[in-house]
Amino acid sequence: MEVGKLGKPYPLLNLAYVGV
């Protein structure tokens, strides 16, 4: 789970990324 990777600039995409 790369929460800190796309968590700052893209919070919504981060949730989708971790969901996948």
Swiss-Prot record:
Induction notes from the record: Expressed equally in exponential and stationary phase in rich medium (at protein level).
Protein name, as recorded: Protein YfiS
Gene: yfiS
